[in-house]
């Protein structure tokens, strides 16, 4: 009697995951910096009545790219939906996105052995 063919799960692609992690890390820091700049712009507008309107536009586009890169990483490392949403929302709080990036990077590198290159 022959065994039925069962589909195999695709192998984990370390290089794609490493690239996704790098993109996420860069965008988490970039989003955090632009969010701090946006907070400065809001204080400057409300307290000193300065008009700096381009920072919010740049931050919006940077956050959009952050969402894409974080979602890409979530798919690559198979995060559950709750964790993915938490990481995405962390990018909306000043400094929290950078803190979450640190812990998520540490977790992904530990879980998948991305500390050393695979050959």
Swiss-Prot record:
Family as reported in the entry's similarity comment: To M.tuberculosis Rv1342c.
Pfam families: DUF3817
Source organism superkingdom: Bacteria
UniProt keywords, alphabetically: Cell membrane, Membrane, Transmembrane, Transmembrane helix
An example Gene Ontology CC term for this record: plasma membrane
UniProt cross-references to NCBIfam families, sorted A to Z: integ_memb_HG
Residue stretches in coiled coil: none
Places the protein is found: Cell membrane
Phylogenetic lineage: Bacteria, Bacillati, Actinomycetota, Actinomycetes, Mycobacteriales
Name of protein: Uncharacterized protein ML1176
Ranges annotated as spanning the membrane: 28-48, 55-75, 80-100
Membrane topology recorded in Swiss-Prot or TrEMBL: Multi-pass membrane protein
């Amino acid at each position: 009697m022959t065994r039925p063919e069962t589909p195999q799960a695709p192998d984990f692609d370390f290089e794609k995951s490493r690239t996704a992690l790098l993109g996420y890390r860069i965008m988490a820091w970039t989003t955090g910096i632009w969010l701090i700049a946006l907070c400065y712009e809001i204080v400057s507008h409300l307290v000193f009545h300065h008009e700096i309107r381009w920072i919010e536009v740049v931050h919006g586009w940077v956050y959009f790219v952050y969402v894409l890169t974080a979602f890409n990483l979530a798919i690559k490392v198979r995060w559950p939906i709750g964790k993915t949403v938490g990481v995405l929302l962390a990018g909306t709080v000043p400094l929290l996105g950078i803190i979450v990036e640190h812990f998520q990077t540490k977790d992904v590198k530990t879980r998948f052995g991305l500390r050393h290159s695979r050959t």
